[in-house]
Amino acid sequence: MAKQEQAPDRANDVFALTSFLYGGNADYIEELYAKYEDDPNSVDPQWRDFFAKLGDNADDVKKNAEGPSWTRKNWPIAANGELVSALDGNWAEVEKHVADKLKGKAAKGEAKGAAGTPLTAEEITQAARDSVRAIMMIRAYRMRGHLHANLDPLGLAEKPNDYNELEPENYGFTPADYNRKIFIDNVLGLEYATVPEMLDILKRTYCGAIGVEFMHISDPAEKAWIQERIEGPDKKVAFTPEGKKAILSKLIEAEGFEQFIDVKYKGTKRFGLDGGESLIPALEQIVKRGGQMGLKEVVLGMAHRGRLNVLSQVMGKPHRAIFHEFKGGSYTPDDVEGSGDVKYHLGASSDREFDGNKVHLSLTANPSHLEIVNPVVMGKARAKQDLLVGRTRDDMVPLSERAKVLPLLLHGDAAFAGQGVVAECLGLSGLKGHRVAGTLHFIINNQIGFTTNPAFSRSSPYPSDVAKMIEAPIFHVNGDDPEAVVFAAKVATEFRMTFHKPVVIDMFCYRRFGHNEGDEPSFTQPLMYKAIRAHKTTVQLYGEKLIAEGLVTQDDIDRMKADWRQKLEGEFEAGQSYKPNKADWLDGAWAGLRTADNADEQRRGKTAVPVKTLKEIGKKLVEVPKDFHVHRTIQRFLDNRAKMMETGEGIDWATAESLAFGSLAVEGHPIRLSGQDVERGTFSQRHTVLYDQENQNRYIPLNNLQKGQAIYEAINSMLSEEAVLGYEYGYSLSDPRALVLWEAQFGDFANGAQVVFDQFISSGERKWLRMSGLVCLLPHGFEGQGPEHSSARLERYLQLCAEDNMQVANVTTPANYFHILRRQMKRDFRKPLIMMTPKSLLRHKRAISTLAELSGESSFHRLLWDDAQYNKDEGIKLQKDAKIRRVVLCSGKVYYDLYEEREKRGIDDVYLLRVEQLYPFPAKALINELSRFRHAEMVWCQEEPKNMGAWSFIDPYLEWVLAHIDAKHQRVRYAGRPAAASPATGLMSKHLAQLAAFLEDALG
């Protein structure tokens, strides 16, 4: 019998003694062998005996150990510490380290053998191997424990087939070893532990109601912090009696609110939180713990599920206001216009105080397009961080300062896994120009997407897996264990406030009813909904737990529910006659601004700048420090610009832009320009950030104009349109003093962010009363570069224009560009500006302005006259107005094509009139101009195909103007490219033929 018991032990010993022979250890053994060949005494005696028997050629061994000739020496650099060795599977290193520690302990008499005598060499080797096996088992729990955690409240999820990967037997331990104390060097907060003691901590930590994924993190400090925070005999999920009662109270509020609405408004859509009520106490914990750690503000973004609950129970929105909206009432005061939105899209803001720490909360309004609010929230948070710090220079804001504002995003499981903007936002999280010191992501994982099962909505085990790409820690938690959910929220908040990095909570829960309250989920998920109908609510389960603990009685719970219902009844009555008071959208940073209420008002703003100021700015724009080595081409660029400033003539597009930025910065307006390659400019035109050719140091002239100026930021963004544009829109919502610009690499690529244009930029003010002064610069122009580098799809933006919602412009002179940029900041309201910007005009000999056109009484012109009428020394002199036979109206670059062709042909009776601002349409100005030419033929000329460009938009406007002036020709004739499916041809010969054809049509 004794022999039989010894057999498994012997097998385990053999396994331990030969495990080094497995392929994964080959590199290590080769290195060890090379050491042995250099000096046999440098390795352990057992290795010495082993290598002595091999008898290999010493040179061959060294060569093999060194690896191929192209490998980099001493690379990769190894992280230090036995813990890290254990994490990367370098077990031989761990064994040596542990053996050394045990030898030291034995020498001091701290480590003794079974008989109480000092450890022998053999016992030290055995103890070290036990330690390694234990650490291997601990590592397995850290890596894979989450797969065995009790996460699904419904118990429908299949357990993975793990081949006993977490069993002690897998690591060479038998029940006979269970009473032996094993040295684990404080890895679980214990110096020595038995196998059962380890398992108790490991199962509780990694296989309970919380499953943690963190072993994909490469930073040892972050990894060690998580381990120390959750591992150990004293690290249980534990709450005080008061804490438990507070959790129960919030759960009763959350459940009671949903049930109350269900009774009062049967069948009305509310997208209830039923089944995910633990979210509410978790959000409270995030705000509370964050406030204790220095958090000042939380910017929330979330979808529809549970939104009304968050608004009322977390944000403190009066219940009577929500009931008023359910009744069909407006959420805005009577004197405020707006088209409105459904109640589960609306935003709100409030202040909450915990333990004397006041935290401001704001919930961002959003459309039904899932996850698109994420970048908007991040942008808002970034702007709030900048405002809090009060940035004046291009210095880095410490992440510890940024951490005072937290973006908190709530997601659905299917949307987090499915929507690409989620991955884009994760990609932004670590970038200098877009980081926000970590977003906290909370996934309400109800294990279904409308009617689609997870197996059909994602290819990964968890909805949160996409977050692993940025090494975010992920806390999976069972929503039916509110204490575990609140604990996970607490640890996640601490991680974010400590390391200023994103973190994810994935709360497994369920959706008690259909996608909305009029839906029947059993059509498509009969088994799931059978289980849900039989499943107790979170309040019932947690109430029973607290009753069992003797903390409350059933009567206490019933009384809490009744008191809450009574409060809601009172609010319901008040909601019948509720009237919203002053709306809050012009408070705080927006104080002093107003809503633009009259489309006919003067909207030019004071945009001119004195010549003296412009010259001072221009002088600074071309100065660089003495020891700064500028690229010689850039030096020529700066020299040319210096000449422009000296003479006041020949101001090109990029110079006008820099003067606009510089003058605004001097006046106290921060400039934030973001997009792909914006520092240099797609067309090598901007160069607002200079690089030293010897050490790559940066120098930004626009940040060195004068003391006390505002900051200029040019941010080369990641290669994304949707998230980056959403982010910049969000930034513009929080800081109306800042000129925020997003530039597309080519305007053609802007439609990658179409949702942001449609759902936010064009309609946000009408839906949610939220103004934005965002500028979108979209390079546009037909120059033979093919269908994807010609058109910003001007027609799309014009189609979105109505109700004075935004501005669309296609300007042709640097002066007008200067004024329209400054106009964004020089009025007491804000409107988005969509601008078609030039490519070939950046260096066109005619597309230049003078300093005089930027100063004095100059301003933005919505219409621009024919240069031949006002400029001296032109190739032709136009006839008097009465003799003009045709007026060709146009917008953008095509004006210069028409101008040069007319000059070439010597035509003097065709007038060219530019429409610089297409919306709001300058009807009155056009009436004034065109009344000069009542008898002339009217032509609209554009370079875009007929079904694109401004034609469809402008035709009815022009018809109205012609009727108004009683023109001889009541219809405008079209001249331009014929209708086309693709915006432009890819053949230069065809491009030139089309250009010649429509110029003939317009001028012939």
Swiss-Prot record:
InterPro entries hit by this protein: 2-oxogl_dehyd_N (IPR032106), 2oxoglutarate_DH_E1 (IPR011603), 2oxoglutarate_DH_E1_bac (IPR023784), DH_E1 (IPR001017), KGD_C_sf (IPR042179), ODO-1/KGD_C (IPR031717), THDP-binding (IPR029061), Transketolase-like_Pyr-bd (IPR005475)
Requisite cofactors: thiamine diphosphate
Catalyzed reactions: N(6)-[(R)-lipoyl]-L-lysyl-[protein] + 2-oxoglutarate + H(+) = N(6)-[(R)-S(8)-succinyldihydrolipoyl]-L-lysyl-[protein] + CO2
An example Gene Ontology molecular-function term: oxoglutarate dehydrogenase (succinyl-transferring) activity
Top-rank taxon, per record: Bacteria
Species of the source: Brucella canis (strain ATCC 23365 / NCTC 10854 / RM-666)
A cellular component annotation (GO) from this entry: oxoglutarate dehydrogenase complex
Enzyme Commission number(s): 1.2.4.2
SUPFAM superfamilies: Thiamin diphosphate-binding fold (THDP-binding) (SSF52518)
Name of the protein described by the UniProt record: 2-oxoglutarate dehydrogenase E1 component
GO biological process: glycolytic process; tricarboxylic acid cycle
One Pfam family this sequence matches: E1_dh
Job of this protein: E1 component of the 2-oxoglutarate dehydrogenase (OGDH) complex which catalyzes the decarboxylation of 2-oxoglutarate, the first step in the conversion of 2-oxoglutarate to succinyl-CoA and CO(2).
Record's keyword terms, sorted: Glycolysis, Oxidoreductase, Thiamine pyrophosphate
Record note on quaternary structure: Homodimer. Part of the 2-oxoglutarate dehydrogenase (OGDH) complex composed of E1 (2-oxoglutarate dehydrogenase), E2 (dihydrolipoamide succinyltransferase) and E3 (dihydrolipoamide dehydrogenase); the complex contains multiple copies of the three enzymatic components (E1, E2 and E3).
Intrachain disulfide bonds: none
Family: Belongs to the alpha-ketoglutarate dehydrogenase family.
